[in-house]
A protein has these predicted regions:
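Long, low-complexity, charged/polar intrinsically disordered regions in eukaryotic proteins
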Residues: 1-35
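Short, well-structured alpha-helical interface segments that form or flank functional binding sites
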Residues: 7-10, 14, 65-69, 75
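Amphipathic alpha-helical interaction surfaces
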Residues: 21, 25, 56-57, 76-80
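Short, surface-exposed, charged/polar-biased interaction segments
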Residues: 32, 36-37, 91, 95
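Short helix-coil junctions and helix-kink-helix linkers
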Residues: 37-65
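A short, conserved structural fragment
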Residues: 71, 75-88
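Short, cationic-aromatic polyanion-contact patches
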Residues: 85-100
């Protein structure tokens, strides 16, 4: 059970890493209408990044889209602002994460 729980939380690391790679902000994307690598489900969007880096999906595969729930959790935790269409790291979290 411990291994499963650790893997569940890893999805947040995947999202936060994408946000840092993109200067603190990334599109949420859309996995309900597109397959991985197409339309709004590319690797630079949160849904595409989760599909590839967390779920191990390959280009052209169908994906699930848990972004609305995960975005709300990151907002509640004070890690990222859950905005319409994108997530953005909070200034406070960036400062703590960068060790300043």
């Amino acid at each position: 059970l411990e291994v499963v729980i650790r893997n569940i939380y890893r999805v947040f690391d995947v999202i936060v890493s994408l946000l840092f790679r993109n200067g603190g902000k990334a599109r949420k994307g859309n996995g309900r209408n597109y397959k991985l690598g197409y339309g709004d489900c590319t690797e630079d969007a949160i849904v595409g990044c989760i599909a590839k880096e967390y779920a191990g999906k390959k280009e052209g595969m169908s994906v699930f889209d848990p972004v609305f729930v995960l975005s709300a959790i990151l907002d509640w935790a004070g890690i990222a602002h859950n905005e319409r269409g994108y997530l953005e790291l909070t200034a406070e979290y960036r400062t703590r994460a960068e060790g300043r």
